[in-house]
A protein has these predicted regions:
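Active-site region of the double-stranded beta-helix
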Residues: 19, 28-131
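Non-catalytic accessory regions outside enzyme or core folds
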Residues: 1-6, 12-26, 30-32
Length: 133
């Protein structure tokens, strides 16, 4: 289940979220004023166990082209991190380490999930994305 939780920071902040929602429209409306887009795409069936990045990108070529046309996203890549991936541990550590990007990025989950923790001003947003996000 996709989930957005918004927390305040500082000494007076509560341990409970100020907002908790799994409604895609509410998530998009909360993120939009922060310059963060959120949408859902139709997941196109299950991936073959041996699907490579090129096959994944080909399945979503029209959606990718639409997003690229609407912003500055010159590069596209895909990663599939399965339990038997040869670099699974190193890649997992890379994704677990808090880091920033100097450019805008678009993420889409065909399968699996990922948690993004965004520190914006005096707010922390936790966005759990799953297949289709």
């Amino acid at each position: 289940m996709t989930l957005l939780q918004v927390f305040g920071t500082g000494p007076a902040a509560s341990a409970s979220p100020n907002l908790s929602s799994s409604d895609p429209a509410a998530i998009a409306a909360t993120l939009a004023p922060l310059g963060i887009g959120f949408e859902r795409w139709q997941v196109q069936g299950c991936l073959a166990p041996d699907a490579d990045p090129a096959a994944i990108l080909a399945n979503y070529a029209s959606e990718i082209a639409r997003v690229q046309a609407g912003g500055s996203y010159p590069t596209v890549d895909a990663i599939r991190l399965t339990p038997n991936h040869p670099d699974r541990q190193a890649l997992r550590q890379k994704f677990l380490a808090e880091h920033t990007h100097s450019e805008d990025e678009v993420r889409f989950f065909v399968e699996g999930r990922g948690l993004f923790c965004l520190h914006i001003g005096d707010t922390v947003l936790q966005l759990l994305c799953e297949a289709g996000d």
